[in-house]
Amino acid sequence: MNVLTIKGVSIGEGMPKIIIPLMGKTEKQILNEAEAVKLLNPDIVEWRVDVFEKANDREAVTKLISKLRKSLEDKLFLFTFRTHKEGGSMEMDESSYLALLESAIQTKDIDLIDIELFSGDANVKALVSLAEENNVYVVMSNHDFEKTPVKDEIISRLRKMQDLGAHIPKMAVMPNDTGDLLTLLDATYTMKTIYADRPIITMSMAATGLISRLSGEVFGSACTFGAGEEASAPGQIPVSELRSVLDILHKNTRG
């Protein structure tokens, strides 16, 4: 698995990189949250645009991207609009979703962008090309809030993301029992050791899946999400607790 280094942050080696989401609804809340989150020193700050009250207004979104870029300084900035069908806060038709991502990429003020795998292969490929032209890295994602697919299906989706040009494939699943957690961890380890030629992010959600958010360095997930002001998905824990566990594992599990 190759390491991806963006602005000096090496994704795919050492401790999993910590991503903190911004979950504010208003511009003021989001900018205040960005200032607070910076103090927690994440590796990557994610703006969850689907929570923003003006997410349908592309001009408002691009203006806020510019303000966030100034606030975050050189911190890595991930732009994510999570669609409703994949657990997001806002309904948006596909053409509007694609246009929003295009606008975000063309600001050149973001470092990474989330593109959902099931947005149509041609659409995804076009967005990946646009991202690469603008020096934006692609986190390609899929989320199952109902269940954990079988191991081969998880691997198949992650491999498809690689084939479509993802710089970082990402998969999040919901466990119904601890066996599902083991399925996700097994799929992650197999993907990392056999198929992945780039960093991947995986997680099993909710309380049952918590160990997957902590054990990325062991099984092969390159980043993990911690809660800043507010969690963006079930199972996220506060960043200070997350970092201390990652640190313990990093110091004590290396051969």
Curated annotation (Swiss-Prot):
Active site (record annotation): 143, 170
Organism lineage string: Bacteria, Bacillati, Bacillota, Bacilli, Bacillales
NCBIfam families in the cross-refs: aroD
Enzymatic class: lyase
Molecular functions per Gene Ontology: 3-dehydroquinate dehydratase activity
Record text on subunit structure and interactions: Homodimer.
Alphabetical list of CDD domains matching this protein: DHQase_I
EC number, UniProt record: 4.2.1.10
Gene Ontology terms describing biological process: 3,4-dihydroxybenzoate biosynthetic process; amino acid biosynthetic process; aromatic amino acid family biosynthetic process; chorismate biosynthetic process
Binding site for 3-dehydroquinate: 46-48, 82, 213, 232, 236
Protein name: 3-dehydroquinate dehydratase
SUPFAM superfamilies hit by this protein: Aldolase
Pathway membership: Metabolic intermediate biosynthesis; chorismate biosynthesis; chorismate from D-erythrose 4-phosphate and phosphoenolpyruvate: step 3/7
Keywords recorded for this protein, A-Z: Amino-acid biosynthesis, Aromatic amino acid biosynthesis, Lyase, Schiff base
Entry similarity comment: Belongs to the type-I 3-dehydroquinase family.
Purpose of the protein: Involved in the third step of the chorismate pathway, which leads to the biosynthesis of aromatic amino acids. Catalyzes the cis-dehydration of 3-dehydroquinate (DHQ) and introduces the first double bond of the aromatic ring to yield 3-dehydroshikimate.
Reactions the enzyme catalyzes: 3-dehydroquinate = 3-dehydroshikimate + H2O
Family matches, as Pfam families: DHquinase_I
InterPro entries named in the record: 3-dehydroquinate_DH_AS (IPR018508), Aldolase_TIM (IPR013785), DHquinase_I (IPR001381), Type-I_3-dehydroquinase (IPR050146)
Gene of this entry: aroD
